[in-house]
């Protein structure tokens, strides 16, 4: 019995250490957004600099995650994407599931899933080596970041304050992303710039 317990304890320590490392390297509100160059599901190269002078939303996603499905099955994520696309916000969805993981989806599979959900991001990015996730210390799906036109992070955290996978919670939720964008685009300081994200772990 000792060996399995020891192995489990070691694995737990590794997971805790990894989580601590991500937290220590987290991109805080007010910090410059890490630059990235990554390929989207159509094979096009996408850089943060492509959206210079615009607000950018980064949405970490994974179709296998029930927390992600909560926001897509309810239409909540698509509504946000479309609402802010109409206000010239660049919304980028990122799947950072490592190519070696069982939940990995190919670019074609991700594209097909997004279409099946009637999603409307400006692009869906395939981070199959999890490099972009590490740069941003993305921890969960969903994990949301809002970047201002000057290239600084003004929000990092959960999509809302209802930390569940229950579709019924969406209607009564306080949506942090909508609030941050609304305040910033009105010339006001962002009241809540950092929250703790919730959801499934990013599959590094």
Specify the residue positions occupied by each region the protein language model found.
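Bacterial N-terminal signal peptides
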Residues: 9-22
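Structural microenvironment flanking redox-active thiols in thiol-disulfide oxidoreductases
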Residues: 69-117, 128-135
